[in-house]
Amino acid sequence: MPRLTGLLVNNLNNDQRALFETLTGGKRSIGRSLDAFLGPDGAMRGPFNAMLHHPAAGAVVQRLGELLRFEGALNDAQREVAILTVGRHWRAQYEWWAHARIAEGVGVAPDLIQAIYDQAPLPGDASDLTAIHTFV
């Protein structure tokens, strides 16, 4: 059972609607349909639904996430290894679910993703990814 009530798109107030448009129309939406953001009940998935419950704070969190993900110094594979490492450490199920697929899509080897999940030494010769994983 979810900890927060799922907010349906048709029931959003103006502030929530503005944040919804930012989340689903920004850099995260490139190559994704609106359905990628919505669960089977029609509410936003994962952390996005929580952001909609407090749109002012949600807008700040969204911008920070966008900055780190899309405007940071790490390349895509390095960023995803960092996200997966933190997500696995904290047993963040949604983060793992979402970013394991993204990581594989940006070229992170499936055996490396599995090693992070298993909390095992990283395989292969990906020294930059191993350095990121060790640092995080």
What residue ranges belong to the model's regions?
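Mobile cap/lid helix-loop segments that border enzyme active or cofactor-binding sites
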Residues: 1-74, 127-130
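Aromatic-anchored, charged helix-turn/loop surface patch used as a conserved interaction hotspot
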Residues: 34, 38, 104, 110, ...
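Juxtamembrane/interface motifs at transmembrane-helix termini
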Residues: 38-40, 99-105, 132
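Amphipathic alpha-helical segments within well-ordered protein domains
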Residues: 48-49, 65-66, 83, 100-104, ...
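Conserved alpha-helical segments that form or flank metal/cofactor-binding pockets of metalloenzymes
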Residues: 57-60, 74, 80, 86-112
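A short structural micro-motif
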Residues: 67-68, 88-89, 119-124
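Short, contiguous, well-ordered secondary-structure segments
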Residues: 78-81, 85, 132-136
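Alpha-helical ds-nucleic-acid-binding substructure associated with the helix-hairpin-helix region
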Residues: 112-136
